[in-house]
Structures are given as structure tokens and as C-alpha cells.
């Protein structure tokens, strides 16, 4: 294959990915400006995994319910994504462990959105306690 062709495909993929991210972030900011129900804002904290958690932490200053879910989303998904990336470098076992971590991420993602929609302040194991401890002070 031609290196030029490979680099063109790679650049187009990254441009598409960056454009998609910017549209999604813009969409989230506009949704927050609409004055949504706090349960829906809690769900949106989990929508883009740790990215939406960080966005809601930066934009929401008052509501403890939303800040808790945003912090929990940010800490949980960023940590698990980093762990999955690091573990995947281990031959054979790393692939299995990384797959299991990614399955756990999807399960926590669904549970987090359901609990937030129901208005519950559900704490994930380990990460929920950390979020509970720090969500009030983070960037206030």
C-alpha cells in the first residue's frame, strides 16, 4: 500500500473524529442552556463517558446531584479507560483483561444513566466514594 494513501485515510479519520467530538460537545452545551430536568442532566453526565462528566463539572456549579454524577462519570470512566489501555499492552492476558474492563465500562455506563434518570444518587464501587469525597470542591 502507498504511504501517501494510508496517511490521507488516517488524517481524514482524525478530522472526522474531531468534528464529531466538537458537534457532540456543542450539543451538550446547548442542552444545558435549555434548562433540562435535573434527572436528564444527570443522564447526560454519562452520555459521552468521562468527557461529558468533565463538561458538566465545568459548567454546573450549584446542583450537588448533577455535580456528583458528573464527578462519578469523570473519575470512573477516565480511570477505567486508562487502566484498559495500560493492561492491553500485556500480551494475551492483557487482551482478555482489557475486554473485561470494557464490558464493565458499558455496564456501569448503563447503570449510571438509569440511576441518574430515576433521581438516585447511586455510588459505583470504589469510584463512587471518591466522587462523593471530591465533587463539592472540584473547580468551584
UniProtKB/Swiss-Prot annotation:
The keyword Transmembrane applies. Disulfide bonds: none annotated. It is found in: Cell membrane. The keyword Acetylation does not apply. It is a multi-pass membrane protein. Its main location: membrane. GO terms for cellular component: plasma membrane. The chain crosses the membrane at residues 40-60, 70-90, 92-112. InterPro entries: DUF4870. Keywords: Cell membrane, Membrane, Transmembrane, Transmembrane helix. Belongs to the UPF0132 family. PANTHER family: UPF0132 DOMAIN PROTEIN (AFU_ORTHOLOGUE AFUA_3G10255). This is UPF0132 membrane protein MJ1527.
